[in-house]
Amino acid sequence: EEGSLILLDGRDNIKRKNSENGYFIGPTLIDKVKSSMKSYENEIFGPVLQIIEVNSMDEALKIINENKFGNGCCIFTSSGEKARKFSQNVNIGMVGVNIPLPVPSSFHSFGGWKDSLFGDLNMYGPDGLRFFTQRKTVTQKWPEESSESKGINLSMPNNLN
């Protein structure tokens, strides 16, 4: 309705018990999203990825940091300098660099900042001791220097090497 473009509709071909009332959605990819749209202003929990194109790093940081939520976001780049700047300046609890999800591993706490922080989901392991700190998790994946860029690789890391 607001002008975004659904590239992959998670409502298609859903055949699950109790899903007819909207309790389940498959992977959904939304392009041409603007920061003024309802889908961006509200935090969507589910396999939904929204794409906002920006003209600069500063514009990206401004859009993200002005949102009242702060759960997770991703950046795809071949520049370590840009990845560091983004990771250090974005007010988000979970940051992904060159991976489609910010926290792909169970040994990290799951939790955001701002209005995305809820309950005690950051309270396991050593994080229980860090309860009164504001934590940021940055998960990164970089291609080998000799490999040529073949576009964005959306595969998850499969080892810790």
Please tell me what each predicted stretch does.
Residues K17-N161:
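Conserved C-terminal structural/oligomerization subdomain of aldehyde/semialdehyde dehydrogenase
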Residues L7-K17:
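Cytochrome P450 fold signature focused on the C-terminal beta-domain
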Residues E1-L5:
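Long, low-complexity segments enriched in small/aliphatic residues
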